[in-house]
Amino acid sequence: MFGALMLLCAGSAALTWRWLHEPPAEPAAAPVATRRIAQRPPTAGHARNPLASGPVWRIVLGIGLLCAPQFAVLTFATVFLHDFGRLGLAGISAAMVALQLGAMVMRVWSGRHTDRHGNRRAYLRGSVFVAAGSFTLLAAATAGSPHVPLAAIVAILVFAGICVSAWHGVAYTELATLAGANHAGTALGMANTIVYLGLFATPLAIPPLLAASSWSVVWLAAALVAGATYPLFAAK
């Protein structure tokens, strides 16, 4: 297994080396208008260091916090389906494949939708609302499991996982746009730092919470964390 993972990582590194290149230099004969646009100095807001920018930090914290419910699903959905749902390998695999495929499709659709309508902030707030609602529904269904079919609980879990995974590209694009081209790398690095802090903390927080309560409380906590990000994606 670990050998296969090593080969996949090596393949990714090889493709990255092969496909990622610096963009070609601007041709000398480029239109004057294009050169003027390229040479136009950034606005005062975009020239500000992202580390000192409140709006940038709000988006960064929103991204980091909203990743926590996603990590909860990615790291503990299989445990939940096995321990709570008593599903076997085939059922768990089918649920996770459906979740990941749905998330992939929704990420692409979300990016195209917001590119066409220019509504990234509104879309992010809507994503927070839907994600928080879906995890609340999952918590309620889990708490009422004696009266809720297992298939419905699995479907809600898959739906919640898709909803909390669909916003990534939109949020990162909004962050890079807010920071400006000259500071996009810094801003994205800030976001990734917070994201990986959540990736570290979420799996550590869930086991003691689960031991002290139940799965419904775990999913409710995920809903509360998702909902807490709503004001961080407020309109400019």
Language model features with spans:
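C-terminal membrane-cytosol helix-exit motif in multi-pass small-molecule transporters
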Residues: 6-32, 229-236
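Juxtamembrane intracellular "pre-TM" segments in multi-pass secondary transporters
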Residues: 21-60
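Extracytoplasmic gate region of multi-pass secondary transporters
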Residues: 54-104, 168
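Helix-to-loop junctions at the C-terminal end of transmembrane segments
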Residues: 106-119, 210
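Cytoplasmic membrane-interface "Motif A"-like loop-to-helix N-cap segments
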Residues: 115-129
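C-terminal ends and interior cores of transmembrane alpha-helices
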Residues: 129-146
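Intracellular juxtamembrane helix-capping segments at the cytosolic ends
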Residues: 165-179
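A late C-terminal transmembrane helix in Major Facilitator Superfamily
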Residues: 176-212, 222
